[in-house]
């Protein structure tokens, strides 16, 4: 008999604890999200950062190339027949890559690309003699990108239209940070004897944004403020440049904020960001390359990479490497998350052209119900036309894509697998040996209408056919989702409530309603209402029930009898 406790890690705080007896049969359900997590190498993306990708173009923009990007394509195009493929994908880059930077005066530009490609990004700041502003250029020839940000520096104009002989404004700044603190409007009959009309506190409070400040100035009698007619000029007001008693009686004068304007325009740029040091002036410079970008190297240990995914809602984890030490680290992380009530699974793969014996050895070393091993490699044509050699760990991402896209509890068994060729075409006896040893493999099938590869079975490395919850990936997956959902429902509805308001019959009715919903949703086959038992003693409720889950069909036996027809005339 196999008994599983969820969560396995003991806690003393108020909680729900569920014990599952898997000795009778396994479990299966349907219709639930299983987010795929990929950890590996790429030519882009900030290291130690979790990215959530919803389409390939988004992933390519960030990751650029490498195993991580190819694995995402495989997961989203896993089968040439079945529609199952991964949904959202969580990705983490493992290299200690560096981005490129360029410092000119008070501006420090930094690339959003982490890698040597970032060194090809160019930036320039020049005069625009037509509008007497500045022009910023960002270019990256490798992507065919060139963007010009023009008319920078002028934010809004101020003009006095009243009867006083003199009018001016002053913008004061902090002596240390060099950020603007106040804007003062003054009028008077003599330049030396003007009177303050209004003082605005900048950088915080009501007037932290220029659009509010401009509206406030326009609300004053005889004063007019207008935004520069080109571009988005709604900047933080503490970015305004300091000036003293600027005359606005004879004509409108523009308030400047070149550094702030540049920062505003680059706020959502895909290639560079900018940091402003207000204590230094902004300098013009010709088109100049950023420097310092490097690809870095993948570390021997990935143990500090996996915890980044701890609270991101992922389920299947694929480390894109054939190193067994990393596989063990990934498994340790998955088991720890599961023990803490957040069930996960790993799908790993070997290298290129590995033998049956090598794959079985890998499976034996892992041997865990939460670990599945892909034991084949091959070649596949990618969407960009490349014919790519794929080691076992890349095939694992494709297997995970199928598993992630199926309903909860549906097996990947006999699902078609999109691949051009495999390095080793295993014989029937070898496929049986791999399957019985807990290694996922694919077989070549051909009939009158179809020629394809298909997955043999969704076995785990635990390799114990007497316990399908541990031996079959889909059955264990279904158990994870059924148990975790039940735990959350009980937590939300009963933990922390007064015992006087909770009766055993109330909890029993709740459990029966929960299981009825699962039955209608075809996530369990059936259950026996009479066998739902609840005992409430003190502050502890003990619940027992018997559920008949749905399993995937693994074997069909057909008996065909031929008879000879006798014709007489």
From Swiss-Prot:
Under the cellular component aspect of Gene Ontology, which terms does the record hold? virion component
| Subcellular compartments | Virion
The molecule here is called Putative tail sheath protein
> In terms of one coarse class, where is the protein primarily found?
virion
Q: Which UniProt keywords apply?
A: Virion
**Start and end residues of each stretch annotated as Disordered:** 1-32
């Amino acid at each position: 008999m196999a008994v599983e406790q969820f969560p396995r890690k003991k806690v003393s705080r108020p909680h729900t604890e569920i014990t599952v007896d898997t000795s009778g049969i396994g479990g299966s359900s349907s219709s639930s999200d299983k987010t795929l997590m990929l950890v590996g190498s790429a030519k882009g993306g900030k290291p130690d950062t979790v990215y959530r990708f919803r389409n390939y173009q988004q992933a390519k923009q960030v990751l650029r190339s490498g195993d991580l990007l190819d694995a995402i394509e495989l997961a989203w195009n896993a089968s040439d027949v079945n529609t199952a493929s991964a949904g959202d994908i969580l990705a983490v880059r493992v290299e200690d890559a560096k981005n490129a930077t360029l410092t000119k005066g008070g501006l420090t530009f930094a690339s959003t690309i982490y890698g040597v490609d970032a060194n090809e990004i160019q930036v320039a700041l020049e005069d625009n003699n037509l509008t007497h502003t500045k022009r910023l250029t960002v270019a990256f020839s490798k992507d065919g990108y060139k963007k010009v940000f023009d008319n920078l520096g002028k934010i809004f104009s101020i003009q006095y239209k009243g009867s006083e002989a003199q009018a001016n404004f002053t913008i004061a700044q902090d002596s240390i940070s060099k950020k603007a603190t106040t804007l003062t409007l003054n009028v008077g009959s003599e330049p030396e004897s003007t009177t303050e009309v209004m003082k605005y506190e900048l950088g915080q409070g009501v007037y932290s944004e220029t659009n509010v400040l401009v509206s406030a100035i326009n609300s004053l009698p005889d004063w007019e403020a207008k935004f520069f007619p080109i571009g988005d000029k709604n900047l933080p007001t503490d970015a305004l440049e300091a000036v003293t008693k600027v005359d606005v009686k004879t004509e409108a004068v523009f308030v400047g904020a070149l550094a702030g304007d540049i920062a505003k325009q680059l706020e959502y740029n895909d290639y560079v960001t900018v940091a402003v040091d207000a204590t230094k002036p902004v300098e013009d410079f010709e088109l100049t390359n950023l420097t310092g970008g490097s690809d870095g190297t993948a570390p021997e240990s990935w143990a500090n990479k996996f915890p980044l995914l701890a609270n991101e809602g992922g389920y299947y984890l694929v480390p894109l490497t054939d190193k067994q030490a990393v596989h063990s680290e990934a498994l340790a992380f998955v088991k720890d998350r599961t023990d803490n009530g957040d069930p996960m699974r790993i799908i790993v793969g070997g290298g290129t052209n590995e033998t049956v014996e090598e794959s079985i050895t890998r499976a034996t070393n892992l041997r865990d119900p939460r670990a599945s091993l892909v034991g084949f490699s091959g070649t596949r044509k990618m969407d960009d036309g490349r014919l790519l050699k794929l080691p076992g760990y890349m095939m694992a991402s494709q297997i995970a894509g199928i598993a992630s896209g199926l309903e909860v509890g549906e097996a990947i068994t006999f699902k078609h697998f999109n691949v051009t060729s495999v390095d080793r075409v295993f014989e029937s006896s070898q496929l049986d040996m791999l399957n019985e040893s807990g290694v996922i493999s694919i077989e070549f099938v051909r009939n009158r209408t179809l020629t394809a590869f298909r997955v043999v079975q969704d076995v785990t490395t635990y390799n114990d056919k007497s316990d399908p919850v541990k031996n079959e990936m889909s059955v264990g997956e279904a158990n994870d989702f059924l148990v975790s959902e039940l735990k959350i429902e009980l937590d939300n509805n009963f933990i922390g409530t007064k015992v006087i308001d909770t009766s055993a019959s109330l909890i029993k009715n709740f459990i029966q309603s929960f299981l009825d919903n699962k039955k209608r949703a075809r996530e369990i086959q059936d259950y026996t209402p009479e066998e739902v038992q609840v005992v409430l003693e003190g502050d502890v409720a003990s619940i027992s029930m018997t559920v008949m889950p749905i399993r995937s069909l693994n074997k069909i036996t057909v008996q065909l009898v031929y008879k000879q027809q006798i014709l007489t005339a």
